[in-house]
Amino acid sequence: VEVIMAMAILVAGGAGILALQQATTEGNLEAREMTTATTIARTWVERLKRDTVLWTTGGAGVPSADLTRTLYLLAVPAAGTTSTWTTPVPPDLAVESYAFDYFGNDTLPTAAGVTYCAQDRLQWVSPGRTIRADVRVWWPRNSRVGGNARFPNCGVGSETAIGNSNSVRSVT
């Protein structure tokens, strides 16, 4: 009887240890996903900063905010209008993209293995002088099963639905 009791305690303890290990593994996986998404967001912030080099302002014969040479800032809505989330589409998706694989590398939006997607929200703070840029990176809650099947092509055209969805995680 004592041996059976000892074995029952051992089995219960072993099951507890396995449950803790599973919880730790899941926590580490989620932390890794958050870190990758944060790194992607930083990458997009740097791309927007790079784009500001092409922004000219003021001077003789130049409109107050000439964004025509920029790649991404050109999408800023008119001053006083509501800003919404959009997907920044680079001119050459083979060079840089709004879609990323599990490791945070740029990839084509239609490629297999797309895990993370980037979006931005641009808004005038001081019209013609200062733009606020928010960057959101999102990925499916269970990226190991099914990937981005619910929002193909990184959800281009579904930005509002993605923001309201319980099936994705995001960092801003």
Enumerate the predicted regions with their spans.
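Aliphatic-rich helix starts adjacent to a transmembrane/signal segment
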Residues: V1-R42
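Low-complexity, Gly/Pro-rich coil/beta segments used as flexible assembly/activation regions
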Residues: T35-T172
